[in-house]
C-alpha cells in the first residue's frame, strides 16, 4: 500500500508543510525563567541513588499513573516493582513467569495497579500489584520487544522482532487486529487522543495510522537514519523522536511539522521521556550523561552523569524525579558495581 511521503524533517530547513521544519524555529536569547528555576531546584536536588533491582541489566523502567510505584523489566526474565517512599525506592515485589528477557513494560494509563510486560518468550503478561499475580498470559506469534497501552486503557499493542504489531483487547486478552509491516518497526505509540497510531522505523520514518481502522495516514521522513524511539508529551502538544543520527526531533502534533532539534548527544538516541508538565525532555544514549532540555527552547537545562550507556529513562508523573537504568557492568568486570540497578535522579543533596 502506497503511503504519501511528506517532505524531509530536520534535514530540510526552510521548507514548510507537513513533515518539515517550522519557519518559526529560532535560537533563544537566554535562559528562560523556567530553566533558571529548574536549575536552581536541581542544584539542591542533584543526587542520584542506585537501588538493586535485578540480577542482570535493566531494559525498561516505568512509573504507575499515580507515581506511587516504579516497575522495571530485565534481561533476568523478571519484572520488579518498587514503592516510592519520600526520597527512596523500596522494593515491593519481583514478578517471575517469563521464560526470556523482559524487554519493555508499561502501566495501565489510569489504573495504578496494572502493568504489562513484553518478553522474548513470545508472550505478554498482565500483572496486578494488589494480588502480585499474573492475571493474564497472552501468547503471541514472535519474540516481543515493544509494548504500549492505549490512552483509553482498552487496548495493548505489542511489536515483535518480525515487525508484526498485534493489538490485544485489555479486557478479554484476545487479539483484535494484527499488522505485518514491510519495514523494521522500532517503538510504537498511540497519540494522546487515541485516534492515531505511530510507529518509528528503521528507514528514519514515522509512520502514522488511523485508529482503530489502521489505515495509513502519513509517513514522515523524520531522520536520515534509523528512527528509534517516540514519546508524546502529557499535554498533547508535541511528540519527540530519537534517532541513530544522535538527534532528538520535536514535532507539533497537530501540524506534523518539526519544531526543533536537540543535538547534544553524540550516540544513537535510545530513550526519551517528557516531564509531567511537558516542559522538560530527557534523552539518553551511549553517552555517559542524560540530557535534560527545556522543550520550548531546546536549551540545556541539566545533564545527569552516568558511567555507562543508558537504556531507559522515565520522569515521575508528578515530581521532577527521573528514573533510569544503565548498562551496569557485571561483577566479573567490576566487583564494586552490581548489574541490574535502577537509578533515581532529583533527590535532595542531603538525603
Swiss-Prot record:
WD repeat intervals: 53-94, 97-137, 139-178, 180-221, 222-261, 264-303
Family annotation (SMART domains): WD40
GO MF term set: RNA binding
Record-linked Gene3D superfamilies: YVTN repeat-like/Quinoprotein amine dehydrogenase
Principal place of residence: nucleus
Alphabetical list of Pfam families matching this protein: Beta-prop_THOC3 (PF25174)
Protein name, per record: THO complex subunit 3
